[in-house]
Amino acid sequence: SHVACGHVGNAATVYPLQHMGHEVWPVHTVLLSHHPGHGGWHGAHISAGDVTAVLKGLKVHGVLERCAAILTGYLGAVAVGKAVLSGWNDVRAANPNAIVACDPILGDDAEGLYVPDALIAFYLDHAIPAADVIFPNRFELALLSGHDVRDITSAVVAARAIMARGPSTVIATSVPVGHELATVLVSTIGCWAVVTPRLTTPVKGAGDVFAALWVGYVLGDANTAAVALGRAVSDVHGLLERAADEALKELPLYKYSPASAVPRFAPAPLKL
């Protein structure tokens, strides 16, 4: 997805990845004025046919073998999801080592479900089994796993239920820990959590930036998924702190580049 004002979707992910030294080929699924959560938005959804055409163009251009990772976010419709899934298959055919990372955007605790119900089944039956990594928030983790997610322990149980469908790694955000929040990584080799203070800010897109940073670190010099977890959480928390301090309505990506500044908060992932 893409917005003209603010930093969500590709407007949140492209710049951090480029700043980390990665070439990025954004494929938009919507073009909006700003995040709908702020109200009064205008724009349009990109058709499944147009998404397919862009992905086909990349294939014809002969660049897919250079694709080291795919990061999928907002789909909005099952037809678009099917077009994206076809793109995943083309990338994997060109580069079997490419990482497929999927942020299963369905909703959140504040707004509930904000996509068509049919997308839940699409993720469960098609996208999640085909992905290597997924990035659900607490609401999405509970919805997709069928488990009540109320703390780190229950998040791990829910993540393992989702992993039984195929992905090797689940990274859950916004998991409650008393008055704090945890980001929990569950993989086939272990579980880790990073706990951060809860901040009050209206900004959108923190999850999008986090997913991009984690993928960027894994493709870069982070030697483990857990190291990438700690770095990505630290960077995003720093952005949210600055947004809260300055009473901003959008993430200040233009002002404070993640993955570059010395973090105010540098938590070490806790091995569970």
Regions found by a protein language model. Name each.
Residues 1-109, 255-272:
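Conserved N-terminal subdomain of the carbohydrate kinase-like
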Residues 3, 30-32, 76, 106-108, ...:
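Glycine-rich beta-alpha junction loops
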Residues 9-11, 38, 111-114, 181-185, ...:
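Short acidic, glycine/serine/threonine-rich loops at helix termini
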Residues 70, 137, 207:
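Residue-level signal for inorganic ion chemistry
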Residues 113-192, 199-201, 221-226:
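Conserved phosphate/ATP/ADP-binding segment of small-molecule kinases
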Residues 196-214, 228:
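Short glycine/threonine-rich catalytic loop with a Thr-x-Gly-x-Asp
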Residues 212-220, 234, 238:
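Short glycine/serine- and small hydrophobic-enriched flexible loop segments
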Residues 226-272:
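Charged C-terminal helix
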